[in-house]
């Protein structure tokens, strides 16, 4: 006897196979059964559309707003430029990190990120500070400069008011902050910190809240928060990946890796982590996805060159069908199923 809904099952299998066979698949629409499905190559971003030359030195990081209307760029010169993406005109030029007295060689901005509602932009700098700016009018919302080592990364929670910050300071490696400041605590500036992970420390007569984690000293190279705001993942300079429950603020897992970690990202559903690692012996970038709960490696992408610089990657495309990675070979690599289209 033919199973119930057998025809529907077969037709669904045909649609799934057409998606798998589509090299440039970049749509969330269900393929039609009336014609063979194939996304056009010309609809895939393979060519340079414009060049932005307002940075005066190396560009270290860029980020699009969630609605795609803005692009923020940052780099070695300490500038943060925000462009509108229709005509690619600058709408803001932020110089907050230039005003730090650390000197021109220590003012580089290594990370920027828009809040989920695109109201705020956080920037992290080598001059040991982070700044949150209001994208609408350009005014500074909050700032923290109490760190003794560079601030390397940040990630927003869904409420667009709280965010986590990772630094290379063993005293303040990982913290949860809010844009709503509190002047209590006797610190040198308003206290925007809600919670911190790391070794015990005190500020004046006040002991800041710490977790009960026993990870010892660590320094953070990158940090990511799941889209639902329940989990956080951090990559450290001693090649560890640590995940945390942001509700209980307790550590969930820790996985030791072989070499230097340069970036980490959650997939949209939070089930995967995308990890970049610098294989120093081979001068190659290693890029793979892993189960965010078990740490099991699921897929590896080969081909990116990495020796000296920080290489980052992210999920991209409709339905996150692709992995996009930088490369020291001056290539942007789009990986769909383990191969590289460069």
PLM ranges: what are they?
Residues 1-342:
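WD40-repeat beta-propeller superdomains and closely related acidic/aromatic-rich repeat-like regions
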């Amino acid at each position: 006897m033919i199973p119930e809904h057998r025809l529907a099952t077969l037709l669904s299998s045909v649609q799934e196979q057409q998606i798998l066979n589509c090299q440039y698949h970049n749509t969330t629409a269900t393929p039609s059964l009336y014609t063979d499905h194939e996304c056009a190559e010309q609809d895939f971003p393979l060519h340079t559309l414009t060049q932005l030359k307002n940075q005066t030195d190396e560009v270290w990081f860029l980020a699009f707003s969630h609605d795609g209307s803005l692009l923020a760029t940052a780099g070695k010169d300490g500038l943060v430029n925000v462009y509108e993406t229709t005509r690619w005109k600058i709408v803001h030029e932020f110089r907050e990190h230039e005003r730090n007295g650390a000197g021109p060689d220590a003012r580089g901005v290594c990370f920027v990120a828009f809040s989920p509602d695109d109201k705020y932009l956080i920037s992290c700098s080598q001059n040991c500070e982070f700044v949150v700016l209001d994208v609408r009018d350009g005014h500074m919302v909050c700032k923290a400069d109490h760190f003794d080592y560079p601030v390397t990364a940040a990630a927003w929670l869904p409420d667009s008011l709280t965010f986590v910050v990772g630094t290379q300071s063993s005293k303040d490696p990982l913290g949860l902050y809010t844009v709503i400041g509190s002047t209590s605590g006797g610190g040198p500036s308003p206290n925007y910190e809600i919670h911190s992970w790391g070794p015990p420390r005190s500020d004046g007569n006040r002991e800041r809240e710490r977790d009960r984690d026993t990870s010892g000293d660590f320094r953070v190279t990158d940090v990511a928060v799941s889209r639902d705001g329940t989990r956080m993942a951090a990559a450290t300079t001693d090649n560890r990946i640590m995940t945390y429950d942001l509700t209980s603020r307790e550590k969930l897992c820790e996985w030791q890796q072989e070499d230097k970690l340069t970036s980490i990202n959650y997939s949209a559903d939070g089930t995967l982590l995308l990890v970049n690692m610098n294989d120093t012996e081979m001068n190659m970038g290693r890029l793979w996805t892993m189960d965010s709960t078990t740490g099991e490696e699921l897929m590896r992408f080969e081909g990116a060159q990495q020796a000296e610089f920080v290489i980052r990657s992210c999920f991209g495309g409709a339905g996150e069908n692709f992995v996009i990675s930088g490369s020291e070979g001056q290539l942007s690599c789009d990986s769909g199923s383990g191969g590289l289209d460069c």
